UniProtKB/Swiss-Prot annotation:
<feature type="active site">
    <location>
        <position position="1120"/>
    </location>
</feature>
<dbReference type="GO" id="GO:0017000">
    <property type="term" value="P:antibiotic biosynthetic process"/>
</dbReference>
<keyword id="KW-0045">Antibiotic biosynthesis</keyword>
<dbReference type="GO" id="GO:0005829">
    <property type="term" value="C:cytosol"/>
</dbReference>
<keyword id="KW-0596">Phosphopantetheine</keyword>
<dbReference type="InterPro" id="IPR036736">
    <property type="entry name" value="ACP-like_sf"/>
</dbReference>
<feature type="modified residue" description="O-(pantetheine 4'-phosphoryl)serine">
    <location>
        <position position="1003"/>
    </location>
</feature>
<dbReference type="Pfam" id="PF13193">
    <property type="entry name" value="AMP-binding_C"/>
</dbReference>
<feature type="region of interest" description="Thioesterase">
    <location>
        <begin position="1059"/>
        <end position="1271"/>
    </location>
</feature>
<dbReference type="GO" id="GO:0030435">
    <property type="term" value="P:sporulation resulting in formation of a cellular spore"/>
</dbReference>
<dbReference type="InterPro" id="IPR023213">
    <property type="entry name" value="CAT-like_dom_sf"/>
</dbReference>
<feature type="active site">
    <location>
        <position position="1147"/>
    </location>
</feature>
<comment type="function">
    <text>Probably activates a leucine.</text>
</comment>
<dbReference type="GO" id="GO:0008610">
    <property type="term" value="P:lipid biosynthetic process"/>
</dbReference>
<dbReference type="GO" id="GO:0044550">
    <property type="term" value="P:secondary metabolite biosynthetic process"/>
</dbReference>
<dbReference type="Pfam" id="PF00501">
    <property type="entry name" value="AMP-binding"/>
</dbReference>
<protein>
    <recommendedName>
        <fullName>Surfactin synthase subunit 3</fullName>
    </recommendedName>
</protein>
Amino acid sequence: MSQFSKDQVQDMYYLSPMQEGMLFHAILNPGQSFYLEQITMKVKGSLNIKCLEESMNVIMDRYDVFRTVFIHEKVKRPVQVVLKKRQFHIEEIDLTHLTGSEQTAKINEYKEQDKIRGFDLTRDIPMRAAIFKKAEESFEWVWSYHHIILDGWCFGIVVQDLFKVYNALREQKPYSLPPVKPYKDYIKWLEKQDKQASLRYWREYLEGFEGQTTFAEQRKKQKDGYEPKELLFSLSEAETKAFTELAKSQHTTLSTALQAVWSVLISRYQQSGDLAFGTVVSGRPAEIKGVEHMVGLFINVVPRRVKLSEGITFNGLLKRLQEQSLQSEPHQYVPLYDIQSQADQPKLIDHIIVFENYPLQDAKNEESSENGFDMVDVHVFEKSNYDLNLMASPGDEMLIKLAYNENVFDEAFILRLKSQLLTAIQQLIQNPDQPVSTINLVDDREREFLLTGLNPPAQAHETKPLTYWFKEAVNANPDAPALTYSGQTLSYRELDEEANRIARRLQKHGAGKGSVVALYTKRSLELVIGILGVLKAGAAYLPVDPKLPEDRISYMLADSAAACLLTHQEMKEQAAELPYTGTTLFIDDQTRFEEQASDPATAIDPNDPAYIMYTSGTTGKPKGNITTHANIQGLVKHVDYMAFSDQDTFLSVSNYAFDAFTFDFYASMLNAARLIIADEHTLLDTERLTDLILQENVNVMFATTALFNLLTDAGEDWMKGLRCILFGGERASVPHVRKALRIMGPGKLINCYGPTEGTVFATAHVVHDLPDSISSLPIGKPISNASVYILNEQSQLQPFGAVGELCISGMGVSKGYVNRADLTKEKFIENPFKPGETLYRTGDLARWLPDGTIEYAGRIDDQVKIRGHRIELEEIEKQLQEYPGVKDAVVVADRHESGDASINAYLVNRTQLSAEDVKAHLKKQLPAYMVPQTFTFLDELPLTTNGKVNKRLLPKPDQDQLAEEWIGPRNEMEETIAQIWSEVLGRKQIGIHDDFFALGGHSLKAMTAASRIKKELGIDLPVKLLFEAPTIAGISAYLKNGGSDGLQDVTIMNQDQEQIIFAFPPVLGYGLMYQNLSSRLPSYKLCAFDFIEEEDRLDRYADLIQKLQPEGPLTLFGYSAGCSLAFEAAKKLEEQGRIVQRIIMVDSYKKQGVSDLDGRTVESDVEALMNVNRDNEALNSEAVKHGLKQKTHAFYSYYVNLISTGQVKADIDLLTSGADFDMPEWLASWEEATTGVYRVKRGFGTHAEMLQGETLDRNAEILLEFLNTQTVTVS
């Protein structure tokens, strides 16, 4: 408070919680326009600016908030200080000499600068105004203030008083204003509230709420920072009137009605009917007499929780929300961060709704119509720390604004939100008694786009049985090789004849149309002969993997009513052990040659079953899916995702009981190509498999995603001859796809998606490129012969971009399940968009991406895919629950960072059980890939308030028992660190294996924790270590090794890049200062050094550089005083024989003398330097200020005594600020320091601005020019 004397102070008191939050953001983001309110008004008529300025000074005197500054340093708790007197000045700018477009440009430039300028709340008047004169009676008024002093509800009061005074002064008449209550009365009221009672209310209100209501799927992933943008629109006068009447009919407010509509809209973007978002409440307690006339910041953000129970109507929802509002009103003063602490998840609110009014025109006109001017085209700019805000203002035509962060949301998405909001309001006005679940947000235009614009046009191809297509391939080239296995090859003619013999034998034993033949074989030529033989007999085949548990095979044979079992002679004994009483035939029985080799006379319909494939089921037993001949034709004939040729050689690496084999077999056999079947030994050896690809000149293959990743890691040569690799079954790994794309080139990789019920895959994504920003691969677009719809639970189309259930129709949709009419009816429904077609509900979640491809978004249920196998976790749970001694069980699948997944079981046991016993039981019932990797025994399963298992509370599977889950500190040092973390993170108990960031940490808290550790333990812990080893155990291990990586003085940014820049810190002393710079140089690894306080700093810098770049020319960088440090380091490196190619310097002069400064001057300069360098978030915290001062003081003391002498061979590139470019003595000072090339360029901004914000963007372009300049280095 040194800038103000006690005589200037009228009052002092604490801040409201909302003010504290805004002050925090102002400190955290200096120079940014968070919570800046900027109102622009065009004024027509006679405006007396001097009179207006005098009127605003009257308002300044009247309301304490306009004379308030905010102090947060050297006080235990921030306070607001009311000054007795402050003088307000309106800036006048005459633009009458400019053209209209020039005037607009000047005003826009001022507005942008005004936003960037912000307010220094510790000293500035928190309000300013500028009036631009455009013509004699045409003005533009820009009025800005910080939201910390005023909210929208107050603005009408202020404006009304302002114009009352203005009119009186203009007409030289007296005026009188009623007395006002100070804002301090509200602060006093706050301190008297029973906060604990209110916290209990919010805890009960939020109990059971899980997740977060967010538009996460619509967020961009490319940019950081906040770029404000808004979309304004309004309801028509008739719609506004009808909507208002609707609210009144249910005795609620227009604000509550808008919240109800928004709830309906956002529910379509969630997978829950339990929603929460922020609402801005007026916060004016009725207990304070005259509160409606008080001015200040009263508003607060509180959560609005909305439960859309089944069948609830819009009118019912309005009543429920109004009741909630009344109940919560006494507790709406509680700050959001305290309410947040009562919730079960780390972040409760993602976006907010604001219903307020800026009645400038109304307030002005209320006072007088004789004041000589009119205000038109009033525009309000405001920016919060939420990426999306829905704002509305009442009026004859209700104004709605979607204010958003353009770096996070696309304009196209915001436009869709607008359309959906208007569509919902229009429907609800017409029928408020309809269930909200039936409201359709998709208008006619979007509906047409979703139905026809995103799906391929229907194709009129005649369907034929598979035997027809195979015979066509045989006739086309009978002597061409068709099938190869383990060195044996059959031509198309030979394969056809062998299949015909098997078909005839099957028919003699009663297998034909309408029957099922089980194929119980190994990978072999006979496998394919058997499949074709079954089809030619008119039957459907049932692939049975001999490795499956006997009980599972028995169930499949019985459930499918298999008429025959077809196997090999060598598997005769194994087959005999099966509990099967039907006919068993042998594919390789020599008596088959007794049968004729010609085609059997069989009438096959394309809609006849071709095979039955069993997949995991929720009942505890697998379910058999029936796939027809026509289904398979839709997959491999007349398709658009790739072209097939009789010159292709396919490789099959899939289990024949897995539907990927369907593609291998039919795509090759029905298109006259060659099929190579890899044997079991080859499948288990990546080297043998890649050798086989090369030896057999394979050019097409389908692999599960897991196998594709494995092969991609195995080498490159095998990919070079392939013209197409298809992969699917799990989420694709972007790094693996990127590697394969680099080797194979565009258009040769296809990511496939589809369930067994959709016949292998229904969508395909042909990879042409992979932008650096991409983090997941789309599953593509619907293939020809298929249509895809993304629907909600009511089978309505989801809005474009919203997540919903992916549903498939078209030729690939199967007939349903064997003996499961109930499940078939549930999952296979009539297509509501194409009468006569069947629609399959996959249970998968997905959404349309802007480019018309589809993004997979998980499962509705607990089904997972592991290594391509579809697994119902319920099936495993039911098997566990049936095991004697198990009281209850739950199974979860965890996806690791590597992309691998594991199944983990949690059991509550009645008697003492061992994991080995349970695992042995499951192995008898389930395929090996369904047996959990871990078994954890609990006393009871954690439950939600709804009685469901709370899977989020299950312990990590690598922990033994729940009671042993937490491991506390092991020594005094760990206890101290745990206590620091506890205070910084607001957590009561910290274990040594708890992740700092998982507990709510972020970069600012990491800086705070590191500063506290140094202060209390004397350990100089690099902040970057918390990102690399974010547990107390990890820190301990690091310290035991003495920080043995040797890199504690360097922060490495853009770690994956190869080209390195070594950056020396400015006088503030921390490499983190270059965090913003690194984002503008994404192609360079930026190794940013901290200032090393020890005297051998140059040797240590040289050692670090040697570790990080052992060879090759070096690039050094410095900003301000860091340039001198870089120069000294370059001399040391050149002495050691290293080649320094260039030193890039930003705004520095060569130090040629010692500065004569005493300790007090150093201290004040350090304080000033820290104030200038507050742009970086990580360096802007009171908690780290002591550490920053120490580091800055050390560097400053070194720098003032430094004299830069000698020369380097390195080139020197100097980028100066605009002002320094005009100082020739600065420009020349570094030229004599190099025998190499010396370049100077004029940059943008002042010295302090050069590496900040938009100025940095422009200067980074010049730095890139320097970096891209090639010079010859002579050693």
